[in-house]
Amino acid sequence: MRILLTNDDGIYSNGLRAAVKALSELGEVYVVAPLFQRSASGRAMTLHRPIRAKRVDVPGARIAYGIDGTPTDCVIFAIARFGSFDLAVSGINLGENLSTEITVSGTASAAIEASTHGIPSIAVSLEVDWKKTLGEGEGVDFSVSAHFLRRIAGAVLERGLPEGVDMLNVNVPSDATEDTKMAITRLARKRYSPTVEERIDPKGNPYYWIVGRLVQDFEPGTDAYALKVERKVSVTPINIDMTARVDFEKLKNVLFGESLQTGRTY
């Protein structure tokens, strides 16, 4: 089996190293990851300049490249360079990736990119103190999250994903053990309420930080509720077709004030 591994924390992240060790038991692991921290880069691609690749020694990997680009760049580079894969994994991320805000996450977006190429994909994230989310994982124990990654990846490689599921978004609580239960969940509506804080520089000019206020109330059945309230491993099936499952007649009535039942064509 050929497995692509990437992340958004960078190729030197301890979370990526833990993922290599877990996945190497299942197949050949090809690592293509950003050379530097690229959290919150979403599904951005580098189109305005060339990207450069550097061979990096990653124990347990079949081959490893660091890319001076985004996580999505890494997936595109890997497929162009090495062909398709049986599975793509993004992680293990420092910090959870929950709710519809996974579209901001470089971790989740890399898995989404791989799934657009027809590759079953998994994004896996470990809940950690926010102060550790921009480091390389020093002092963080990834063993339990690696256990769940190996377990879930093995199941996907053996049985595939159900029809209509393109990727799995997995979040592991910081206090999880190998006996922690898993929950199949849906995305919460929101995890953060973003706003802007103003500061003044030494010359008296304003500058701004985008900051997120945590949302505390989550509906049962969501990924945020499973992780934050039930302390379970959340597994959310994702379909990259974001078309709303709505009766088109109702939307036509909103847009045009009439339905097809009147005989009117649109």
Swiss-Prot record:
GO terms for molecular function: 5'-nucleotidase activity; metal ion binding; nucleotide binding. The keyword Lyase does not apply. Binds 1 divalent metal cation per subunit. Its EC number is 3.1.3.5. Its cofactor is a divalent metal cation. It is found in: Cytoplasm. It comes from the Archaea. It catalyses: a ribonucleoside 5'-phosphate + H2O = a ribonucleoside + phosphate. A divalent metal cation binds at D8, D9, S39, N93. Pfam families: SurE. One of its GO terms (cellular component) is cytoplasm. Keywords: Cytoplasm, Hydrolase, Metal-binding, Nucleotide-binding. Its main location: cytoplasm. Belongs to the SurE nucleotidase family. Nucleotidase that shows phosphatase activity on nucleoside 5'-monophosphates. This is 5'-nucleotidase SurE. The gene is surE.
